[in-house]
Amino acid sequence: MEDGNSQGNRQGGGRGRGGRRGGGSGQSREMQISKALSRLLRHQAENAGIKLDEAGFAPLDKVLAYGPLKSLKVTVEDVQEAVASSDKQRFSLKPNPETNPSLSTTSTSAADYLIRANQGHSIKLESSATLTPITLAEPDTVPARVLHGSYFAFWPAIIEAGGLKKMNRNHVHCSTGTPEEGVVSGMRKDAELVIEIDIVKSLQEGLTWWKSENGVILTEGDENGVVSSRYFREVRGRAQDVGVLWQDGQRVADLPDGITIRVPFGKNAHGGRGGNHGRGRGGGRGRGS
């Protein structure tokens, strides 16, 4: 969070912590706020008539007028807490210099702030305005490791596509480590496969890489939006030992028989939580991540 401190605990009303739950979803109010902010700032701003600046920031007062947030009666304090408490540092909040020339971080007026999602957009933004470039000309910017987390269900589709596809997002998302190593952004905690990418080779061959404010490593891929499998330094399982599937740009093994294949929640393009499982050789349905 760019403006520093959150405001601490809230009191009162039916809007307290864990209070109102919508649509039978069982989600806490805080989770509903975070998801609504992500959905708007990453994907729906244009449809909602909200103009993002070149760095991806939107006026907070207009954001809070967005239907799902308005229905939750979200306050500046709620947003400050959502920004400060996000385990993956999904958002940045800063004073709006046009309406808040003193750059106060204690104002309770939404008009005095700008907010953005740090990455994950399908809305087209200029990467150079929102992200830090990773280049061979500045070796200190190049991470020692670049990892992409995926799932057994999607591995056949990754092979078929010839690599990782950015899909409907602007970038393929990667991390500099795994969740068990304390890296909280760039890889889902339930990822089943770790794909290590040779970032140096890919940079040498023309791929562009970036780092977001919350430490996610991003690339647009090649002209087709793909990070080629020839850049896969190694692919292996996380919790399940499935051996090494790919090494130094070459396929060395298939997924073993008998493993459980599941489509993770939120990743099934055709709805549902994923199914029963078998080997799932036809799985993935085009997902690249």
For each feature predicted by the language model, list its residue ranges:
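Eukaryotic, polar/proline-rich low-complexity intrinsically disordered regions
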Residues: M1-S289
